[in-house]
Regions:
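Alpha/beta catalytic cores of nucleotide-metabolism and tRNA/nucleoside-modifying enzymes
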Residues: 3-32, 37, 43, 156-159, ...
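Active-site beta-loop-alpha junctions enriched in small/polar residues
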Residues: 36-38, 62-64, 98-100, 125-127, ...
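Short acidic/polar active-site loop segments enriched in Thr and Asp
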Residues: 54-55, 118, 191, 246
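Conserved residues at the C-terminal ends of beta-strands
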Residues: 60, 123, 196, 244, ...
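Short glycine-enriched, charge-decorated loop/helix-capping segments at active-site entrances
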Residues: 72, 135-141, 265-268
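Alpha/beta enzyme core
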Residues: 109-120, 124-130, 134, 146-222
Length: 341
């Protein structure tokens, strides 16, 4: 069986996207890469920012409980902190904290600030049941006063030149406290607010309620970034129109199509064949920090999402669907012995 590079490059299908598009986002506006626990780690951030079109990344969350974390915890989750808080492509990375204790979050933010992050983001949006049961993420949206206390404490704890932003959903079980939470975040001194246009109960089920972001944007005096269910250029157009925002945050959509930010900007986008070296680069990167038993799963997770956009990703996924052995994945997809045992 021919490896990925050979077999797929022989079957490159015409791209359904025009190579040059009318920009959906003014050139002076920005596109952010979302934090996604278990998916968008530093390896995938590296790949996606190499493709281009991203202005700012936000890391997956760093869980803060009742302890002052050592700096190595921050740099393990956000190794870009050792590179001027930027990816290899030079894109700034903000580090995200998640917790419910204002004092402990402030203490950890102060320590994180010693590593000079491009910014500190606060997570009020994670819908994961495990996180919510431990009073973290979107469940905090039931307590706007606590949300305010957290943002205010972190803002006081870090130097003024380090931005403190927040990411929230429309609410926990419903959106009744949506504006109260937005006001809590704004009045506490946040520099920016990202809004995922669904509640915690909505999870990731479509649709996203972009029009609700417009209500938030009209109610607060700080920049608001729209997030949620943007998979295509048309989605981006609709999101911008309905939310009234001029800045987008992309999550699963750009994992499925790493060139989505370029397409939204109306720039030339790479073919599947041009993405193949980046897929191999990702595989080599995860070999350095993901255990062998989970390594194939990480690659299949990405290929599974890419199947939405690229027929060739379906071929690649099928090649490795039944194996979790890194050496076999290496041989099937890249046609060379594994670089790591």
């Amino acid at each position: 069986m021919m490896p990925l590079r050979s077999s797929l490059s022989m079957h490159i299908l015409p791209s359904p996207r025009s190579p040059l598009l009318t920009p959906s986002l003014p050139s002076h506006q920005r596109i952010y890469l979302a934090p996604m626990e278990g998916l968008l780690d530093h390896s995938l951030r590296d790949v996606i920012t190499r493709v281009g079109g991203i202005d700012v990344c936000v890391s997956e969350f760093i869980r803060v409980t009742d302890q002052l974390l050592p700096k190595r915890v921050f740099t393990r989750v956000v190794p870009e902190l050792l590179n001027g808080s930027c990816t290899a492509a030079g894109v700034p990375v903000r580090a995200q904290l998640l917790g419910s204790d204002p004092h402990c979050l402030a203490d950890n933010a102060a320590r994180l600030a010693e590593l000079q992050p491009a910014g500190i983001d606060l997570n009020f949006g994670c819908p994961a049941p495990t996180v919510n049961r431990h009073r973290g993420g979107a469940v905090l949206l039931d307590e706007p006063d606590l949300v305010h206390a957290i943002v205010a404490a972190v803002r006081r704890a870090v130097p003024a030149q380090i931005p403190v932003s927040a990411k929230m959903r429309l609410g926990n079980r419903d959106d009744l406290l949506m504006l109260a939470n937005a006001h809590a975040i704004a009045s506490a001194g946040a520099s920016e607010l990202v809004v995922h246009a669904r509640t915690k109960l909505h999870g990731y089920r479509p649709p996203a309620y972009w029009d609700q972001i417009a209500r938030i944007r009209q109610a607060v005096q700080l920049p608001v970034v729209a997030n949620g269910e943007v998979w295509t250029v048309d989605d981006a157009v609709q999101c911008l129109a309905q939310s009234g925002c001029d800045t987008l945050m992309l999550g699963r959509g750009i994992v499925a199509d790493p060139a989505l930010a370029l397409a939204i900007r109306g720039l030339l986008t790479p073919s599947w064949q041009a993405l193949l070296p980046l897929i191999e680069h990702f595989w080599q990167r995860i070999a350095s920090h993901v255990s062998p038993r989970h390594r194939a799963g990480r690659l299949k997770q990405w290929l599974n999402l890419m199947r939405r956009r690229f027929p060739q990703a379906q071929v690649a996924f099928d090649l490795v669907r039944t194996t979790n052995e890194p050496g076999m994945v290496q041989t099937l997809l890249f046609g060379a012995p594994p670089l790591h045992p």
